[in-house]
Amino acid sequence: MKFKVNNKEVFASTGGRPFDKNKPAIIFVHGSGLSHITWVLQTRYFAFHGYSVLAIDLPGHGYSEGPSLKSIEEQGKWISDVIDSTGIKEVSLVGHSQGCLITMECAAQFPNKVKSLSLMGGAGAMPMNPELLDLAEKGDLKAVDLMMDWAHG
């Protein structure tokens, strides 16, 4: 499903069922560098068991337009904008990894919109190496190499 948020096209998987804003809704939020694909099995299960689901691609990820948002606060606000754009009245948010931080931020900023949170594989905010951050902001692919070296030792 594609829809607009802040004049940018957003992609969300609906688990193989049409989205219905009148059903109980769940928004699944992926981690950094990932996409809606993280949630393929979960969205399908809940979509076929009475829920409307959206596994969104954050801006700059997957099939969603726009540059990546710079802060967790901006991303939490963006999730609220997704809620408003789709007409959902109250939603359960599910986050993985950085998606945990984003969903917690959304719930903190907009508690009247969020019914519940489910957090998987979350962690606290990590300090970033300034050199790595600089390379990533410039779009230098060396940033990916550095992250992979760190991740795989």
Task: Label each PLM-derived region with a short phrase.
Residues 3-15, 40-48, 52-98:
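Active-site loop/oxyanion-hole signature of alpha/beta-hydrolase fold enzymes
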Residues 31-34, 97:
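Active-site glycine-rich loops that stabilize anionic/oxyanionic intermediates
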Residues 26, 76, 100, 129, ...:
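A general structural signal for well-ordered alpha-helical segments in protein cores
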Residues 33, 58-62, 124:
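Alpha/beta-hydrolase active-site loop signature
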